[in-house]
């Protein structure tokens, strides 16, 4: 048996429940004209004739309505506009990822500065940053040291970030989440 690695992605563009011209199988429709005006309830043959006279398509846009709603429109143009809108929406979407920076309660100044520099890079790129401190062994009894380190980290990034989630404990780990400041863009 032969299987191909290449799969063709089939996109249904603007054809969710739309029936066009000869695909429409109802007797009468509530007709909407080219400019969006109501033309009333018409037999399908008359609606099709009106669409043919205007050199456009008759498209059934709401088949579940009583009577079904059909619109006289240029389907090719409608499909093009729909694709254009979808493309614009995809461009406007921004994927926000959460990057993690791990610290220890007894972190040294040099290491702290390196982690801080990395977090600043993430924030400048528009990513959120989760700053976590893992307590090992008996360090769990000194949570205030971890809270102090997180407070220093938040203070050092306050010019480009806002605290989205305050420092809190989760098991043997204390964390807070920073988000890029929106007004600084």
From Swiss-Prot:
**GO MF terms on file?**
ribosome binding; translation initiation factor activity
Q: Which domain of life does the protein's organism represent?
A: Bacteria
Q: Name one GO cellular component term.
A: cytosol
Entry-linked Pfam families: IF3_C, IF3_N
Cleavable signal peptide: none
**Single GO biological process annotation from the record:** ribosome disassembly
Task: Provide the protein's localization.
Answer: Cytoplasm
The record, for InterPro entries, names: T_IF-3_C_sf (IPR036788), T_IF-3_N_sf (IPR036787), Translation_initiation_fac3_CS (IPR019813), Translation_initiation_fac_3 (IPR001288), Translation_initiation_fac_3_C (IPR019815), Translation_initiation_fac_3_N (IPR019814)
User: Coiled-coil region(s) at which residues?
Assistant: none
Keyword Acetylation in the entry? The reply is no
Q: Give the chief site where it resides.
A: cytoplasm
User: Does the keyword Protein biosynthesis feature in the UniProt annotation?
Assistant: yes
Q: Which UniProt keywords apply?
A: Cytoplasm, Initiation factor, Protein biosynthesis
Query: What this chain does, per the record?
Result: IF-3 binds to the 30S ribosomal subunit and shifts the equilibrium between 70S ribosomes and their 50S and 30S subunits in favor of the free subunits, thus enhancing the availability of 30S subunits on which protein synthesis initiation begins.
According to its UniProt record, which protein family does this protein belong to?
Answer: Belongs to the IF-3 family.
| PANTHER family for the chain | TRANSLATION INITIATION FACTOR IF-3, TRANSLATION INITIATION FACTOR IF-3, MITOCHONDRIAL
Q: Summarize the subunit comment.
A: Monomer.
List the protein's name.
Answer: Translation initiation factor IF-3
Organism classification: Bacteria, Bacillati, Bacillota, Bacilli, Lactobacillales
